[in-house]
């Protein structure tokens, strides 16, 4: 009887270990590369599979955190304009930028602001949060 319980416990333990290992592997995401130069400009990407819209905001000359009333740059998940695969939840944009230092964030569904988890540097945003930093050479 004790041997039977020990075998049953071992099988149950092994099953739980296998299931928990398999489940945790589903949460590991492929790390995206930080913004980098491509022929047309700087390539930005952000992983947001459940988003309906993702925008790029920053102190770029053409939007300056909306200081001039312009719109944020619209990122795509449609397989066009720098986006590689439509519908994969990876939003992308290629933005022409001159050499300089830029601070930026991603705006998801118009109201949630996020730093770039792949950025090489962040800085205090002056409001208790952080901005991602990009240096274009």
Q: Would you name each region that the model predicts?
A:
Residues 10-20:
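Bacterial N-terminal signal peptides
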Residues 38-44, 52:
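Structural beta-strand segments of beta-rich domains
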Residues 49-99, 109-136:
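Aromatic-rich carbohydrate-binding modules that target alpha-glucans
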Residues 26-40:
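N-terminal edge beta-strand
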Residues 2-11:
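Bacterial N-terminal signal peptides that target proteins for export
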């Amino acid at each position: 009887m004790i041997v039977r319980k020990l075998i049953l416990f071992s099988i149950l333990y092994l099953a739980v270990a296998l299931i928990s290992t398999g489940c945790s592997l589903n949460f590991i995401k492929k790390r995206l590369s930080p913004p980098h130069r491509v022929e047309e400009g700087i390539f930005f990407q952000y992983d947001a599979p459940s988003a309906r819209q993702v925008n790029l905001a920053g102190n770029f000359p053409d939007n300056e955190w909306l200081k001039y009333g312009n719109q944020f740059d619209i990122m795509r998940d449609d397989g066009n304009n720098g986006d590689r695969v439509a519908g994969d939840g990876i939003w992308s944009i290629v933005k022409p930028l001159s050499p300089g230092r830029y601070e930026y964030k991603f705006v998801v569904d118009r109201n949630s602001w996020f730093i770039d988890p792949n950025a090489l540097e962040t800085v205090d945003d002056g409001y208790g949060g952080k901005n991602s930093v990009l240096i274009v050479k």
